C-alpha cells in the first residue's frame, strides 16, 4: 500500500493515530487514522415518480400509480465515508425517520448529513439501503461535496452488502461520542504477522481487521489488569508489557 501508520506523533489536539504515504513520510500530510461514522440522515427521504410525466391523483398519499396494485417496500438508508485511498468507515446510525415506504414506480432522494471537520482525506459518500431480507446493500457513491443523492435502482441492481458496520476508528481522545476513549489516543502501534495491527490505550489492547489498518472493531478489544506500556509482536501472538 506504500503507507505509513504511526501513533504517539503530535501533542494535544493532534495526538491522534495518523497515516501518510511512505513516499512523502517526514514532509507530507498526515491524516487521522480511521474514518468517522456520519451523523444520522437529517430528514425523511423524499419520494418521486420514475415517470416525470405521470399524472398523480389529487390528494394521493404518495406519488405512485401503483397504490392499489402492490404493497410498498419499507426501506432504510445509511451512509458511510470513503477515503482517498478507498478505506471505508462505519455507517451512520439508522433512524425510524429514515425509513420510507417505496412503490416500484418511485425514486427516492436522500439528503446527506453535514460533513465532519478534521478529516481531510474523505473523498466519497457511499449510500446503502435495505433489501427484502433487511441487509444493507450498496446503492451508489457520491462526491464528498454532494448534498443529496437519487436512488433510482431496483433491488436486483443493488451491489455488495455493507462490510463496515463494526469498523470504528482507533481510540482517539480528540474525537467525541463513540470514538472517544477515557485513556486517550491509541499508542504503541505494532504490526503482527497475520496482517493485523495492534495498539493500546490505558489497559485496553486494540486490534485492527486483518489488512485493514483503518478498521478497529470494538469487539476485538481486550483488557489487561494493569496499564500497558508496550507491545511486541511474536510469531505465535502478541506480548503485552505492563
Q: Residue ranges of each PLM-predicted region?
A:
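Disordered, low-complexity "stalk" and linker segments at domain junctions of extracellular
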Residues: 1-195, 201-203, 207, 213-219
Amino acid at each position: 500500500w506504500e503507507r505509513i501508520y504511526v501513533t504517539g506523533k503530535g501533542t494535544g489536539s493532534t495526538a491522534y493515530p495518523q497515516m501518510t504515504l511512505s513516499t512523502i513520510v517526514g514532509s507530507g500530510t498526515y491524516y487521522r487514522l480511521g474514518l468517522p461514522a456520519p451523523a444520522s440522515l437529517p430528514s425523511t427521504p423524499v419520494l418521486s415518480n420514475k415517470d416525470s410525466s405521470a399524472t398523480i391523483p389529487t390528494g394521493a398519499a404518495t406519488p405512485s400509480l401503483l397504490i392499489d396494485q402492490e404493497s410498498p417496500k419499507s426501506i432504510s438508508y445509511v451512509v458511510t465515508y470513503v477515503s482517498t485511498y478507498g478505506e471505508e468507515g462505519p455507517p451512520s446510525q439508522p433512524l425510524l425517520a429514515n425509513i420510507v415506504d417505496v412503490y416500484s414506480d418511485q425514486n427516492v432522494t436522500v439528503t446527506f448529513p453535514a460533513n465532519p471537520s478534521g478529516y481531510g482525506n474523505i473523498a466519497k459518500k457511499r449510500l446503502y439501503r435495505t433489501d427484502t431480507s433487511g441487509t444493507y446493500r450498496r446503492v451508489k457513491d457520491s462526491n464528498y461535496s454532494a448534498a443529496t443523492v437519487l436512488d433510482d435502482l431496483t433491488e436486483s441492481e443493488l451491489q455488495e452488502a455493507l462490510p463496515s458496520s463494526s469498523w470504528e476508528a482507533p481510540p482517539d481522545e480528540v474525537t467525541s461520542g463513540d470514538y472517544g476513549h477515557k485513556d486517550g489516543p491509541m499508542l504503541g502501534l505494532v504490526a503482527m504477522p497475520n496482517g493485523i495491527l495492534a495498539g493500546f490505550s490505558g489497559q485496553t489492547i486494540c486490534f485492527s481487521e486483518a489488512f485493514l489498518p483503518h478498521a478497529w472493531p470494538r469487539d476485538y478489544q481486550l483488557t489487561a489488569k494493569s496499564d500497558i506500556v508496550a507491545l511486541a509482536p511474536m510469531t505465535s501472538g502478541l506480548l503485552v508489557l505492563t
